[in-house]
Amino acid sequence: MLISMDPLETPHSCIELTKALGEKGVINFSQVEHIIMKYNRSVKEVFQLFDLIRILTTDHAILTRITREVIEDFASENVVYLELRTTPKRNDAIGMTKGSYFEAVLEGLRSVTSVDVNFIPHDKEDSRTLFSPNNGSSRKRIYVRLLLSIDRRETTEAAMETVKLALEMKQFGVVGIDLSGNPLVGDWNTYLPALKFARNQGLYVSLHCGEIPNPKEIHQMLDFKPERIGHAICFEKEHWEILKSSKIPVEICLTSNIRTLTVRSIQVHHFVGLYKTKHPVVLCTDDSGVFSTCLSKEYKIAADAFVFTGLGKRESFELSRNAVELIFAERQVKEDLTKYFDSVAKTMGVYKNKIHSYEL
């Protein structure tokens, strides 16, 4: 479930943070302002923006703020389960290690006050679940779980360091490993040892797959059989056959794919073919700030564009409910969410609650 944590809830919030670093001499603001404000960006421009985000998120205080704001934003639109993807980074100039980076994320989780957040695995808490009748809270509630991302620019050793950090932090809601970053760089065999180790140690694995034409790597990724893949755009016939036979769930990011021009138009998006054949899919935002979207908007885009597939209110609700089986959280969370969705289905004429995944 592609949700990336980034400082771009709006272009203005990114400009605010960038200006602050510009005043400190860390960034030349005039060189990046136009990239922030641009609406449609090419793949190359998107990764230029990600380079800026990388700088912004190598600051503990900013990272804590972003984490808090991302959770509050998704909770405000009735998201009840959120997987946050975040790439642990180093910044020797300020003493940031991958470990201290993660601690800043944790501080952001703990600092949320507007909503009840559950990020500790269920077996570490009492028997009450977040949506159980005896919970005793009338406030908005949200489950949050974390995926630590391996950046494609990293070495095998750096990738392994991220996996080991994920294992150390499982008690704080880390459920898996993600492979992401600029698809134009790196080689699959660089990350494979770390990904195999992660799987052998019980972590789930999600891969950004097929963002650009790379038939060999796509085949290698599908052969690895990750628990989920994101995008699946530049697939050839052979890749589609492998994907559909393996039933690997796909994270669909409509706005992201259109604005990076990797899909020609919404009408020809591969979501239709996957949905009609009942392949496991889930709608996601990718980087919601980068692409100026939110989960509600992604569902509306799908409903408006694919009405001919019969994707009405009930089907959209079922699409979100079915995503419960695709999340990386523990069994008790899945059971709690399923009961909650069933309760909503019985009591509300309009279905309002969603499942989602995001990145920092």
Residue ranges and their predicted role:
Residues 1-203, 211-217, 221-228, 233-360:
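Metal-cofactor-binding active-site regions of metalloenzymes
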